[in-house]
Amino acid sequence: MELILVRHPQPDVEPGVCYGSSNIPAAATALSEGHALLAAELAPALASGFRLYSSPLRRCTALASLLGDFTPDARLAEMNFGAWELRPWSGIPHEEVDAWAADLLDFRPGGGETVREVACRVQSFLDELRHDAVVVCHAGTMRLMAAIAAGEPLQQSAAKPNHIKYCEILRLSWPAKSV
């Protein structure tokens, strides 16, 4: 199966704020520009029977609704950062960020989810998938899906900096094709 992962448009939040699972909308201009950029590129896949899924968070569903009929799935949501949500990264105590960096898979940032827990729900979504799909979601979700599809250790994936831009597309095969 082919998976086309799409990161949501830029959210309507100040730069430098931790927003993980907070249900903030996409910025209006970013949404219209993102739709204009993606609609033509995704049209052939959607017209050929790819199913459309979305994280239930507004910054994703707003784009998905412009692309077509979609199925929201909570397993596609971004990581919950607990008490860190909607706080400036600069206001989160350094010792807490350092504790997360020392245990990327099992530390609970702000008392929220662990990376391992997010990976388990993402894996569950992938395991149930039976058809080609376009998935509107988040950079964290996309990175975990890519790691799972590539058979990459989660620790290695979690340690990589995020380079996925807003409205960027990532194409994967699932299950991964054997060589």
Regions found by a protein language model. Name each.
Residues 3-4, 50, 128-140:
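Generic beta-sheet signal
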Residues 10-12, 58-59, 77-78, 140-142, ...:
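Short, solvent-exposed loop/turn segments at secondary-structure junctions
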Residues 54-55, 120, 136-137:
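Short beta-strand scaffold positions
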Residues 66, 128, 148-152:
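Active-site catalytic microenvironments for nucleophilic, acid-base chemistry
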Residues 67-121:
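Phosphate-handling substructures
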Residues 139-143, 168-170:
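GST superfamily/GST-like fold recognition
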Residues 152-178:
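Domain-level recognition of soluble alpha/beta enzyme cores
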